Amino acid sequence: MIRDEIPISAQVLQWRCVESRVDSARLHYSRFAISPFRSGQASTVGIAMRRALLGEVEGTCITCAEFKRVTHEYSTILGIQESVHDVLINLGEIVLRSDSYETQKAFISILGPKKVTAQDIILPPSVKIIDTTQYIATVTKAIHLDIELKIEKDFGYRIEDPIKSADGNFPVDAVFMPIRNVNYSVHSFENGNETQEILFLEIWTNGSVTPKEALYEASRSLINLFIPFLHAEKKEFIYGLKNTYESNMSYFSSPSLSADIDEMTKGVTFKHIFIDQLELPARAYNCLKRVNAHTISDLLNYSQDDLMKIKNFGKKSVEQVLEALQKRFSINLPKNKLHFH
């Protein structure tokens, strides 16, 4: 018998912050307690949360620097104490916070002699420097130092190939991970005749996000990963899964799957799956957000022609959306508007 509803556990988890402190501008710490778990559950959640915190929380970094009249990363600039390579390393360590997913530009334009710090960076309104005292370079002579910076938001890290540098543009190795460390511990306690567990989660950040914000973002990332499994109780989907492995693979690769999923999406199948799962480039993602297309269900209200009408949403962005929908959900958006009744 197939259940039409997923049973909800009577177990009610509660969490609270038991300790929080700011050790420095670039080191924030909080300790959270979550309970009660049944025996064995706390460790499962702890492992998943640690991985999500370290790998799924986004950060903002300087990813490229343009120097005028400089041809090589290991060049020296007359009147600058550091080599270009050393300046790039210092720029990569600057901690930023941004509310925008668009690629941003920032500038350094100073007259020496002067000690150059993060405070000297001219930023767009959506970007904030966490520690303005971070060191960049020392200008020892009365010369101008002009650097144009590219700022991006992403997750993980990006190690650039120095060969890609050209015309004074030098990539910066970017670490987009605002979480410096995560620890968890599990403690058992007796509740009547039942053994339950409490999970303690310790989070250290670089100050660009608070530990509480990081906990929220990591939790949302995990929820998004598991939402597709919640819809496996759909009868038309479950019946298909009763076939052999080979039949399943044939079914999933066939055009009929698109029609099946289109039927499912007429209801609430994708109502709670956010477009974050499509992993779209920043331009396409932000354009969809601006028109309040927050979920896959919202996006399915658009045809290809509708997407083309969105401001700054070009043909390339449409192709990126179509490719992501097909790859992740085997969905094809119609060319023209379809009306569901």
UniProtKB/Swiss-Prot annotation:
EC number from the UniProt entry: 2.7.7.6
Keyword terms of this UniProt record: Chloroplast, DNA-directed RNA polymerase, Nucleotidyltransferase, Plastid, Transcription, Transferase
Catalysed reactions, as listed in the record: RNA(n) + a ribonucleoside 5'-triphosphate = RNA(n+1) + diphosphate
Record region (Alpha C-terminal domain (alpha-CTD)): 265-341
GO terms, molecular function: DNA binding; DNA-directed RNA polymerase activity; protein dimerization activity
Positions of region (Alpha N-terminal domain (alpha-NTD)): 1-233
Subcellular location: Plastid, Chloroplast
GO BP term, pick one: DNA-templated transcription
Subunit structure: In plastids the minimal PEP RNA polymerase catalytic core is composed of four subunits: alpha, beta, beta', and beta''. When a (nuclear-encoded) sigma factor is associated with the core the holoenzyme is formed, which can initiate transcription.
Family assignment from sequence similarity: Belongs to the RNA polymerase alpha chain family.
Domain commentary: The N-terminal domain is essential for RNAP assembly and basal transcription, whereas the C-terminal domain is involved in interaction with transcriptional regulators and with upstream promoter elements.
Its biological purpose: DNA-dependent RNA polymerase catalyzes the transcription of DNA into RNA using the four ribonucleoside triphosphates as substrates.
Protein name in the entry: DNA-directed RNA polymerase subunit alpha
Gene name as annotated: rpoA
